[in-house]
């Protein structure tokens, strides 16, 4: 019981109680959780569902059927669907093809393609051809809609709203490394990958005072769909090195320009770069094979990576319905929830795979029903292995539930005004428990 109570201190810290409520479950636990809810004196709406996975019966319920925004708890559905439709050993392929005097970089939706991976492809190509007239970019494995339904139009350059493409690299972001310069001079800012695809203007200032600082900002001209970055504001002269990530516009062209620069580094000259769907008579020059999907799934859940979630969804659509778009992928997810988890999907709304959209609506009971189904499924262990553990490094619960970490595996979720936690508690008293 101790572990469930500590868990619900977390839940009610971001929620409040109605003045009068009727709930169900274990009498002892109900009294203690209700007392925590009442004493919180906060003012938000909440839904709670705790279900014993031994008996299938509720241990505690409060507004459990109320539809609320799940935020990144949507990734629970996405992860399970990827394991079901694609499999833990699914691989993403990025190909370089040859056609006459041209080369084609063909994306396969790899969410974890790195700059190093791209450079290895460039090196392999440089050993097989002497020159390239045009580098064509083929991202047609998935559709060209960059942003999900209901994503806020003014998210701007933030990393969590990176555009989605079958040709993605470095999370479709630039990493800026910021540290103070000499007093009165600009901050020292380096960025990776170092590419001519972006422009960069540094108007920051290093100062000796540590109060009333003008916040240092790195912005992109996102409203005009450009990759012109500017740095403004102040930095204290004793500040530590910091890393800031910002997304880029047109990830396909970003990946293509990077690849062109790498090919040139390895001795090739390329005259043009443009987008084009590959024809059938092209020969393969080089291929990058991703790590197994389970590795990307772990990254999805522990880092709450939105790009990975949406690439999973579109790839599910491509493999299951032959159309690599959000509708096909989400229809597949809803079908899985309805047919396998026996959830009435007409009573929920799934607008994307990551939970960024505020159009998503799910109840706590739907989430615990889903978690109960996964617990009995063939990929139970794989799914649970991807979930962050309390107090475990490199996960979204790294600073939470440190003492109880061995008993809790759960996914966080957060938007402005929204905070969620769903997963499993392995309780010495109640046995395995699903909660949301």
Task: Describe each model-derived feature in a short phrase.
Residues 45, 99-173, 181, 317-366:
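Mid-domain, small-residue-enriched loop/turn segments at the edges of structured enzyme/sensor domains
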């Amino acid at each position: 019981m101790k572990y469930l109570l500590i868990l619900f201190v977390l839940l009610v810290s971001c929620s409040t109680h109605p003045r009068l409520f009727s709930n169900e479950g274990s009498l002892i636990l109900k009294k203690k959780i209700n007392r925590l809810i009442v004493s919180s004196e906060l003012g938000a709406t909440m839904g709670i569902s705790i279900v014993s996975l031994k008996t299938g019966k509720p241990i505690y319920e409060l507004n459990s059927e109320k539809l609320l925004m799940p935020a990144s708890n949507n990734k629970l559905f996405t992860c399970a669907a990827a394991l079901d439709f694609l499999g833990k050993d699914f691989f993403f392929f990025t190909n370089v093809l040859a056609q006459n005097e041209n080369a084609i970089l063909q994306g396969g939706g790899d969410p974890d393609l790195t700059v190093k991976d791209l450079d290895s492809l460039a090196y392999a190509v440089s050993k097989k051809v002497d020159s390239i007239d045009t580098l064509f970019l083929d991202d047609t494995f998935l559709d060209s809609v960059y942003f999900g339904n209901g994503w806020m139009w003014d998210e701007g350059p933030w990393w969590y709203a990176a555009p989605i493409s079958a040709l993605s690299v470095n999370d479709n972001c630039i990493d800026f490394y910021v540290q103070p310069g000499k007093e009165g001079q600009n901050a020292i800012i380096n960025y990776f990958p170092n590419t001519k695809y972006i422009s960069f203007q540094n108007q920051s200032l290093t100062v000796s005072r540590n109060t009333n600082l003008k916040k240092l900002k790195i912005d992109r001209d996102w409203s005009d769909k450009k990759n012109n970055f500017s740095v403004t504001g102040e930095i204290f002269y004793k500040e530590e090195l910091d890393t800031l990530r910002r997304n880029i516009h047109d990830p396909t062209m970003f990946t293509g320009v990077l690849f062109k620069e790498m090919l040139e580094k390895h001795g090739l000259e390329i005259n043009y770069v443009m987008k084009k769907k590959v024809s059938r008579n092209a020969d393969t020059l080089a291929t990058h094979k991703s790590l197994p999907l389970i590795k990307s799934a772990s990254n999805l859940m522990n880092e709450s990576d939105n790009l990975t979630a949406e690439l999973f969804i579109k790839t599910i659509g491509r493999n299951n319905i032959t159309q690599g778009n959000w509708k096909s992928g989400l229809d597949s997810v809803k079908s899985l929830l309805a047919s396998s988890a026996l959830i009435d999907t007409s009573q929920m709304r799934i607008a994307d795979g990551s939970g960024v959209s505020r159009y998503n609506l799910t109840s706590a009971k739907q989430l615990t029903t889903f978690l109960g189904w996964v617990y009995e499924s063939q990929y139970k262990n794989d799914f649970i292995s991807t979930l962050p553990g309390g107090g475990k490094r490199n996960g979204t619960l790294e600073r939470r539930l440190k003492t109880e970490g061995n008993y809790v595996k759960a996914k966080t979720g957060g938007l402005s005004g929204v905070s969620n936690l769903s997963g499993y508690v392995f309780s010495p008293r109640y046995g395995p428990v699903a909660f949301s």
